[in-house]
């Protein structure tokens, strides 16, 4: 029988000092026999996805204490990728994931907490906490802050839905008036919550639900809706029960490594492919799997990507649907239900509810259950009012979207495409693989060939795009932006957004060892591995080199002779200590970022630390 971790600090005469300090936090004698549960919050006023979380930690804590536990709150950092975008701040985004994971480990192990409720929401916070949860392997439930309502405004007497990416594209489009650009900017992000499309934050929150670590509705129920309160309350109550099952009944099935097993990771990735999620999810799932010592690799993702259809199309891949529409169509459980009917899921998995997949879908898939409470839950919709308050409204759609032929979520036989929304490509330009979000690629661009235009920084590429120096048919190659080479693996949302604003979104390709925002669409190929700084062939590309992309056959190729490629490699190695570094880039890199770069692996390994360098 496992012993409560917290007993290390609450029992025994030699822990008198620790108990004295616990008493100073408000604990009493009666509390020293209860489980101590960490409420891991991520409130900050810097990030709209987290600005409303301040009081939600106390909401969870109150339920923990009412159910017989002791709640102790702490906060992690949270970087807003949108605000950090387009300047040196983006270098810090991905490295913050490792800091978040480490900080959770530090706090939970230093104070011997028994379990956790993780309150996350945005891009690197959910994966950072997930990495920590699988590293620590103590009972955990995730509950996110929820998605933002889609922006809405009238243009030419037509009501349109908007999100952050629309504001960026319009702002850079010289054909758009200042007045229209400002109108869209003001309407694009109307409420608190994670940005309203299937960007990285919402993708990851959907995946925690698919992994079984979050409650049904977590990925899609709006941040502003009153119904979301119940998720926080139930998380607080249920974590106490899970904690007691593990420590008092030796039930290891409640632990995160038991729930988020390889079969669950495959289900989560299957969901991701079916809904055309952010390519960043590939990085984060690979990283989390390594923390949990789960044998889940890019090869598994490649295998799944070849058999899973595209069942749910959401912004930025279409302007028609946002997360509020996904929720109306049944949310994550609705997509999983269609995947299950298609025979594409592993059914032998469980979740924090203690239910298997079949029983979960029987209860929570709107196509299988006519339960009034369930129907009411998934009719929760937007109010269209600007607010930063959670639970601020209780509007409901008149009816659910159960149209599986032409609705937001579709059955396999009516899929948007029989090829899924993500694909792994490989070839001499990316020997260890690269990722493309096929959900956002125009069908006419699935096979593409063009001359390379090489840039050694995102900033240099943006200058060329806005300066009119990029032409239809060009293949932009942005290198030395990988985990080590950046360092920090910047997102390339600005280059892709500016290509659209210049009318080149469907006429050019972009290849990088960096990554892309979940808001990216178009022929954008990222995570090229090995990265340039690790000796990858992307470092050897020269202006004018022909590059061939064939998504249907999963191939990417630098179309030059192998002898020429070998010669260029020898020439690069001849640079000595300057080999595999940018030739002409001025970028200030802090000591903190250099420390990250010294241990970073390429994207095919999740951009995690190289354990071999740490002796394990």
Swiss-Prot record:
Q: Where does [2Fe-2S] cluster bind?
A: 122, 195
Residue positions of the active site:
517
Q: What class of enzyme is it?
A: lyase
Coiled-coil spans are: none
Q: Which domain of life is it from?
A: Bacteria
Q: For this UniProt entry, what's an example GO CC term?
A: cytosol
Assembly, per entry: Homodimer.
- What name does the UniProt record give this protein? Dihydroxy-acid dehydratase
- Organism expressing this protein natively: Edwardsiella ictaluri (strain 93-146)
* Species lineage: Bacteria, Pseudomonadati, Pseudomonadota, Gammaproteobacteria, Enterobacterales
Gene that encodes it: ilvD
């Amino acid at each position: 029988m496992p012993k409560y971790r917290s007993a290390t600090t609450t029992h025994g005469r030699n822990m008198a000092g620790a108990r004295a300090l616990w008493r100073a936090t408000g604990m009493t004698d009666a509390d020293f026999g209860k489980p101590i549960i960490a409420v891991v919050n991520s409130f900050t006023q810097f990030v709209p996805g987290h600005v409303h979380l301040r009081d939600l930690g106390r909401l969870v804590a109150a339920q923990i204490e009412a159910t017989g536990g002791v709640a102790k709150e702490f906060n992690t950092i949270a970087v807003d990728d949108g605000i950090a975008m387009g300047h040196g701040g983006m270098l810090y985004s991905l490295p913050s994931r490792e800091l978040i994971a480490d900080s959770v480990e530090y706090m939970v192990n230093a104070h011997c907490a028994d379990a956790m409720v993780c309150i996350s929401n945005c891009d690197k916070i959910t994966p950072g906490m997930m990495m920590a949860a699988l590293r620590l392997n103590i009972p955990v439930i995730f509950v996110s802050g929820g998605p933002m309502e889609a922006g809405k405004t009238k243009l030419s007497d037509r009501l349109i839905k908007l999100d952050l990416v629309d504001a960026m594209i319009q702002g850079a489009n010289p054909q758009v008036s200042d007045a229209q650009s400002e109108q869209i900017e003001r309407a694009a992000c109307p409420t608190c919550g994670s940005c309203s499309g299937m960007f990285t934050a919402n993708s990851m929150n959907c995946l925690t639900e698919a992994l079984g670590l979050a409650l049904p509705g977590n990925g899609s129920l709006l941040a502003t809706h009153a119904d979301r309160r119940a998720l926080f309350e139930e998380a607080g109550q249920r974590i106490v029960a899970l904690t007691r099952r593990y420590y008092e009944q030796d039930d290891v099935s409640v632990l995160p490594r038991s729930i988020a097993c390889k079969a669950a990771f495959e289900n989560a990735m299957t969901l991701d492919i079916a809904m055309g999620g952010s390519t960043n999810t590939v990085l984060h799932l690979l990283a989390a799997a390594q923390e949990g010592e789960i044998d889940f690799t890019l090869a598994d993702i490649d295998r799944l990507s070849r058999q899973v259809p595209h069942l749910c199309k959401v912004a930025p891949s279409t302007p028609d649907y946002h997360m509020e529409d996904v929720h109306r169509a049944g949310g994550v459980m609705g997509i999983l239900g269609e995947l299950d009917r298609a025979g594409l899921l592993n059914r032998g998995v469980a979740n924090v509810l203690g239910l298997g997949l079949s029983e979960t879908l029987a209860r929570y898939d709107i196509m299988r259950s006519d339960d009034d409470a369930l129907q009411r839950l998934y009719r929760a919709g937007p109010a269209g009012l600007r607010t930063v308050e959670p639970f601020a409204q209780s509007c409901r759609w008149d009816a659910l979207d159960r149209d599986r032929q032409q609705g937001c979520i579709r059955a396999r036989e009516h899929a948007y495409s029989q090829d899924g929304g993500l694909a792994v490509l490989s070839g001499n330009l990316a020997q260890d693989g690269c990722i493309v979000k096929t959900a956002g690629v125009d069908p006419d661009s699935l096979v593409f060939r063009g001359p390379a235009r090489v840039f050694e920084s995102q900033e240099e590429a943006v200058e060329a795009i806005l300066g009119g120096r990029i032409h239809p048919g060009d293949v932009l190659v942005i290198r030395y932006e990988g985990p080590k080479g950046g360092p920090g693996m910047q997102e390339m949302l600005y280059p892709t957004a500016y290509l659209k604003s210049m009318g080149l979104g469907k006429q050019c390709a972009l290849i990088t060892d960096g990554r892309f925002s979940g808001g990216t669409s178009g022929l954008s190929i990222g995570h090229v591995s090995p990265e340039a700084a690790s000796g990858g062939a992307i470092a050897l590309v020269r202006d004018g080199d022909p590059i061939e992309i064939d998504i249907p056959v999963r191939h990417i190729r630098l179309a030059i002779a192998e002898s020429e490629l070998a010669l260029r490699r020898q020439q690069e190695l001849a640079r000595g200590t300057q080999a595999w570094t940018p030739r002409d880039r001025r970028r200030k890199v802090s000591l903190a970022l250099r420390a990250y770069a010294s241990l970073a692996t390429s994207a095919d390994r999740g951009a995690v630390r190289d354990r071999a360098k740490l002796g394990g």
